[in-house]
Amino acid sequence: MGRITVWDEINFGGYATEFTDSVHNLSAESGRGPVVGSENWNDQISSWRVVTGQWQFFEHAGYGGVATKVYGPGECLNCAQAGFSNKWISSIRKISD
């Protein structure tokens, strides 16, 4: 089963959550937001760790807009190091387990 952990701050800081399936709209992840009063993870991710599988990030909901390359097991301490902005991701696609 594919698994990815995301954080709302760089260097695995702040709040974290885990996904095991694609999320076509991070705004719909109600109750999983990084701070009290935050309803979702849309435009909140700043670092991540791919535990298993292959994953791809998208600028807009529904896997729209700019797409990143596909990432396999490994980690990114700062989205800017991967070539895109922090707090930019609006959907996540699991490519494989």
Where are these regions (language model features)?
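Compact beta-sheet-dominated domain cores in extracellular/mature segments
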Residues: 1-97
